[in-house]
Amino acid sequence: MSRKKTIKDYENLAATRNHEVISVSNKETPSQGDITLLCKTCNKEFTTTTISYQNARKTGCPHCKATSASLYWTGRARTKTPEQAKKNAEIKEHINKTRKEKGKAFANIKNKEDLKEKLTNDLYLPNGEKNAYNDFILKRLNDPVTGKMMEKHHIIPLHAGGPDEKWNLISLTPEDHIEAHNLRYLVYNETGDKNTIKFRNKTPNVTDQISKAKALGNETRRAQGTGIYEPGMSSKAGKIGGSVKSVEKDLKQSTKMTSGVYDALYNGSRWKHTKTNTEIVIPPNTIVKMPQLVEKLIEALPPCEEKTRLAGAKLTTATSALARVIKGKNEGGRSSYFGWSICKE
């Protein structure tokens, strides 16, 4: 059991931060109260909880923190760099293109009656269960609910390729709007619906529903030949996984990479293993994430101790270490990791 902290402990901590303790609200148990201090750096008083002050990453003075932030941004641009702006534009373009492709499935729907027919035809799932979302929407279309506060809901969501047309809209109460996305998430297991529910701050207990949601979504994808059942998908490590890249996610990750790591992944690189004299060339645009590089380096090695150790290393540790190898020892990185070094022409 750790020793109970006293006022003296907080006075000593304050002294190291150039602060002076003025008062403590809970003298019996200081760690459970508030503390008021004088910052001798900015000559201002501030009050915070003792726990917050104790765990502060720097001095804990909000005035000094605000001043430091202001000085940091003085003369600095807060806008995106041209590279980041370009990548964000690529992400947006890809999302719009994906939605347009998905929207082709609904090109034959021209009005509300066509939509009702579509919902009715898809009223039952491949496993024989009723499509709870379609059933809910059909009931609201046939027997509209009125109220003072109504919200517009896209019956076929925009994220699923639905158009922003009058025939694709329905007026729902706020409660029904949340329920609609909840039911659709249960049936189709799409992230867009889940995020909408979270945004409304009324997230259902997904933990209790996840098994049913996955089962229903799995049946739907199996019948439609999409997702993990799309031709060209592969199985690995006992789990069904997709070979189709999440382009949006990859592009977002690339904006956070250092220029060296970005070049090594997207523009290609050559690696050499010292002990086994193994070399591997990573062609441009074949891998886009550091975990993929780790996998390539493991596969390239013949059976040896370092291959076993690399395969058993924690993935975050391996990716971080290889990023430092790419950076180079002269730049504050490292020269190699488990024998692998990058060949810089």
From Swiss-Prot:
GO cellular component assignments: chloroplast
Protein name: Uncharacterized 38.5 kDa protein in psbA intron 1
Compartment annotation: Plastid, Chloroplast
Lineage of the species this protein comes from: Eukaryota, Viridiplantae, Chlorophyta, core chlorophytes, Chlorophyceae
Keywords, comma-separated and alphabetical: Chloroplast, Plastid
CDD domains: HNHc
Predominant localisation class: plastid
GO molecular function, one term: nucleic acid binding
Superkingdom of origin: Eukaryota
InterPro entries: HNH, HNH_nuc
Biological source species: Chlamydomonas moewusii
